[in-house]
Every structure is written in structure tokens, then in C-alpha cells.
Swiss-Prot record:
Keyword annotations of the record: ATP-binding, Ligase, Nucleotide-binding, Protein biosynthesis
Function according to Swiss-Prot or TrEMBL: Allows the formation of correctly charged Asn-tRNA(Asn) or Gln-tRNA(Gln) through the transamidation of misacylated Asp-tRNA(Asn) or Glu-tRNA(Gln) in organisms which lack either or both of asparaginyl-tRNA or glutaminyl-tRNA synthetases. The reaction takes place in the presence of glutamine and ATP through an activated phospho-Asp-tRNA(Asn) or phospho-Glu-tRNA(Gln).
Domain of life of the source: Bacteria
Identification of the protein by name: Aspartyl/glutamyl-tRNA(Asn/Gln) amidotransferase subunit B
Similarity-based family: Belongs to the GatB/GatE family. GatB subfamily.
EC numbers on record: 6.3.5.-
Recorded name of the encoding gene: gatB
Upper lineage: Bacteria, Bacillati, Actinomycetota, Actinomycetes, Mycobacteriales
């Protein structure tokens, strides 16, 4: 199937009327440890290619791996947050395959003895209900390198004239979280897939184990989809759509595969068990035939001891598990007294935690929401970054709010102060001073500007004296322009009306 043949797809409502989708989600999360999984190389995104490598992560002869303790603790915390059983004995295994992004020609992973098993995540849906997704396992492994293919129209290896390998990512610690089959979702399957990945992403952020930047590959999702006729017990043949790199794409990929597979089955064909590539135009294309575990020839990793976390360690780490983000948001919503719609907008903007942190600095939630949910969202969109990537902190936003509350800044001038902070000019009060933005509080200075504006506009003065007090707005505007917005508009209006006998 390609984008050009979408007319051949079965209507989605028709699909769910006759077939039952079965999904399975495999999510890879890169851990934000200081170093890689089995060596001392820095774990950092965006470095020059092949500068964060060593004999261990390049798989050179004689180099031996040493397990990263912080990665193990992060894996245990993830397992606990997913309500998993932490196994008392976990073993690493070699997953053998040959591909240019794998310098050792095998990947150190976990096979039949993972660190966490049999969990679940209660996923919040848009209508306020939850859907329990059962977790089969969460296991540790190392990431592969990254390939860049040149000369191919698709950016993939097929048709490429040159392939470049960057091994900076090779050996970065990963947690792969695998669900049990998700059944019974029906027409909500695409929504539930997206909601699950969304919830997982929020959970990883709350745990502070990963930045889960899907655009940078620190969170990657593979969606498995199969169809079975309504009432059938046996699962259909599944496909696995690899490396879906946005929340919206997760939903689109599942929906597309359901429609595509239904078209294949309706035509009397057989769904091929294969991996598929997702295209941003909203369709999937064939990748390779899907391997089985036997194809990888797993065997125990001889250079690493088993992982045997003590009960004391597990219980200590259990105390570090935070409140689930969506439950925290519900509590915060009740505290703030905002509607579901307002809260949803804040969630979609990624502003909830930022607003909460700003409130913690002693300002009202209303003022904090106004900044993070409006002006700063616009600035983030203009810069093409996430809201929490803006170079301004909740403490700095709170400082701006306090300057307004203290009468030192107007809302209009406050926006200029925030722009100065974003530009790296310093703390809010310093920016206010350096830019000369503080409100003028001296009545004699304001009165002089008022007198000048009145003298320049005698016709407007006569209107005000005649009772048309709304005409005072023109004088107020002239004064604000003359003072470059640094006068208190309310005080200016009082002085104008008083001068015209309308106080």
C-alpha cells in the first residue's frame, strides 16, 4: 500500500463492525544516565559523530562491559511505577544479528529473564475513563548506533548510494516496555494506543529517567496490529510498524494498519508477518519479514553477572516513585478550580508542571496560567521548541508576576521583561532596570506629561469637560506614548479627569 492507493482501504467503521483489532505496543526508552550502559562514554545527544565511543561500545576485541548501576536502578523504578514484579534474578543475553548499526554484531539485551514482569498501567482517556493496559515485561538493553542513508528518495537503505554510521548512540541504556495483547478496544484501538504512549511518556518524565524526546529518538514506539473476525478466538497475523516517532503518528499508524489489513483479508489475501515503515503522509510500507526469537540465537551473556536486586534496594527505590502524573493533575485541577477544557489546554501545551512550579514560588495559579498558557506558549511556538525548553524558569516567571502585583510593571511592560529574560539579558528585575521599563510612580512626572498632552489637544479637553469622559482615552494614550508605557494608565486617567473637572 502507498498513499496513492488509500482509496482501496476499507472504511474504518466497516473494519470495526466486522473485525476485532488486537494490539501490542513495544516502547523503547533511552535512559538519561550520565554514561552508557556498559562503559564510561558520555550519554549525550547531539555530539559530533563518533566522538562518544570507546573499545567497549565499539565491540573491539578484549573490551569487557561493566554494568551501569544507575541504569539498573532506573529500570527497577520504571518496573515499580508500572506495577510490575521485580524479579529477584535477571540475566543479560546476547541477541545476535548482523547490521551496520550494531558494531559488535550482537546486542546485549535481556531475553527470558527480564528485570520486571507482569505489570499494568491504567491509562486515562479523553472522555475521563481509564483503560488498563497489561505489561508483559520491561527489560534492559543497549541501544544501537544510528545510520544515515544518502542517495535514497525515502532516506532508507533501499536505493541509498552511501550509508553513514554514527556510534555515539551505541551502548546507550534502554528500557524496552512490552505490553500483553490489548484486546476489546474495537473502534477505540487507535485512541488507546496513543493514550498509552502518552501516559508512558508522562510517567517517564515524572520518574525523571528520560527526556522522552520522540523527535530525537529517546522514546521510540513499535506498534503491533492484527485483526481477527468478530467472535474468533485465534489471533490474526500481526505486523509491526517500527519507530513511530510522534504521538499523533502512533494513532494514525494503528488506524491505517487496521484498514489495510482488512482490505487484504476482504480480498481473500493473507496478511504477511513483517515489519513496516511508517510515513509521515499517514501510511505504512513493507520492511522486512518479521524475525522470531530463534532467528536471534539468544544465549546468556558470558561477560556479565546476573542482576539480583536485594529486597532492601527494591523497597528503597519504591519510596522514590512519584504520584502518577494524571492523578497529580486531577488533584491540581481541583486545587486550581479550573474546568476540564482549561486543564486539557494546559496539558496539551505541556504547561501543568510549569504552572504548578510557578505557583510554588508564591503567586496565584491564575497569573501563572496566564503566562505559561498564553504568552510563553506563543514564544515556544515561534522558537519551534517545547514549552519547557524555553530559557525561562518558573522562578523567573513568578518574579515577573510579583513585579506586576507590586505595581512596578504593567502587564504590557512585563511582556517586554519576559522577552528580555528569554534573550538572556538577566533576571527579571535586572531586565526591568536595564531597559528602563519600571512604572513611573512619581505623580509630578506623570502630571507633567498629562499637562503637555492636554495642552496639545484642546478640542478633546473641551469634550471631556462637556461630560464625554470616554474621550479621556485619547489623552491617556498620548501620555502612555510619551512615557513609553511606563506610566500607570489608571493613574493617568485619574489625573486627566481631575484636570478637566471630572474627578
Amino acid at each position: 500500500m502507498t498513499a496513492a492507493t488509500t482509496a482501496e482501504l476499507v472504511d474504518f467503521d466497516d473494519v470495526v463492525a466486522r473485525y476485532e483489532p488486537v494490539m501490542g505496543m513495544e516502547v523503547h526508552v533511552e535512559l538519561s544516565t550520565a554514561t552508557k550502559m556498559f562503559c564510561g562514554c558520555a550519554n549525550r545527544f547531539g555530539a559530533e559523530p563518533n566522538t562518544l565511543v570507546c573499545p567497549v561500545c565499539l565491540g573491539l576485541p578484549g573490551a569487557l562491559p561493566v554494568l551501569n548501576e544507575a541504569a539498573v536502578e532506573s529500570a527497577i523504578r520504571i518496573g515499580l511505577a508500572l506495577n510490575c514484579e521485580i524479579t529477584p534474578w535477571g540475566r543479560f543475553a546476547r541477541k545476535n544479528y548482523f547490521y551496520p548499526d550494531q558494531p559488535k554484531n550482537y546486542q546485549i539485551s535481556q531475553y527470558d529473564e527480564p528485570i520486571a514482569v507482569d505489570g499494568y498501567l491504567d491509562v486515562p482517556l479523553e472522555d475521563g475513563t481509564t483503560w488498563r493496559v497489561e505489561i508483559e515485561r520491561a527489560h534492559m538493553e543497549e541501544d544501537t548506533g544510528k545510520l544515515t542513508h544518502l542517495g535514497s528518495d525515502t532516506g532508507r537503505i533501499a536505493g541509498a548510494t552511501t550509508s553513514l554510521a554514527d556510534y555515539n548512540r551505541a551502548g546507550v541504556p534502554l528500557i524496552e516496555i512490552v505490553t500483553k495483547p490489548i484486546e476489546g478496544a474495537g473502534a477505540r484501538a487507535p485512541e488507546i494506543a496513543r493514550a498509552y504512549v502518552t501516559a508512558l511518556r508522562q510517567l517517564m518524565r515524572a520518574l525523571d529517567v528520560s527526556d522522552v524526546r520522540m523527535d530525537q529518538g529517546s522514546m521510540r514506539c513499535d506498534s503491533n496490529v492484527s485483526l481477527k473476525p468478530k467472535g474468533a478466538k485465534e489471533f490474526g497475523t500481526r505486523t509491526e510498524t517500527k519507530n513511530v516517532n510522534s504521538l499523533r503518528s502512533v494513532e494514525v499508524a494503528v488506524r491505517y494498519e487496521m484498514r489495510r489489513q482488512a482490505a487484504v483479508l476482504d480480498a481473500g489475501g493473507t496478511v504477511t508477518q513483517e515489519t513496516r515503515h511508517f510515513h509521515e503522509d499517514g501510511y505504512t510500507s513493507p520492511g522486512r519479514s518479521k524475525e522470531t526469537a530463534q532467528d536471534y540465537r539468544y544465549f546468556p551473556e558470558p561477560d556479565l553477572e546476573p542482576v539480583a536486586p536485594s529486597p532492601e534496594l527494591v523497597e528503597r527505590l519504591r519510596t522514590t516513585i512519584p504520584e502518577l502524573p494524571w492523578l497529580a493533575r486531577k488533584r491540581i485541577q481541583d486545587d486550581w478550580g479550573v474546568s476540564d477544557e482549561v486543564m486539557r489546554d494546559l496539558v496539551n501545551a505541556g504547561a501543568v508542571e510549569l504552572v504548578a512550579a510557578t505557583v510554588d514560588h508564591g503567586v496565584s495559579s491564575e497569573a501563572a496560567r496566564a503566562w505559561w498558557g498564553n504568552f510563553l506558549v506563543q514564544k515556544a511556538n515561534e522558537a519551534g521548541v517545547e514549552l519547557d525548553e524555553l530559557p525561562i524558569s518558573p522562578a523567573q516567571v513568578a518574579a515577573v508576576v510579583k513585579l506586576v502585583d507590586e505595581g512596578k510593571l504593567s502587564n504590557k511592560l512585563a511582556r517586554q521583561v519576559v522577552e528580555g529574560v528569554l534573550a538572556g539579558e538577566g533576571e527579571p528585575e535586572q531586565v526591568m532596570t536595564d531597559r528602563g521599563l519600571a512604572l513611573v510612580r512619581d505623580d509630578s512626572v506623570i502630571q507633567a506629561a498629562v499637562d503637555e498632552a492636554l495642552a496639545a489637544n484642546p478640542d478633546i479637553v473641551e469634550k471631556i469637560r462637556g461630560g464625554k469622559v470616554q474621550a479621556a482615552g485619547a489623552i491617556v494614550g498620548a501620555v502612555m506614548k510619551a512615557t513609553k508605557g511606563s506610566a500607570d494608565a489608571a493613574r493617568v486617567r485619574e489625573l486627566v479627569l481631575a484636570a478637566c473637572g471630572q474627578s
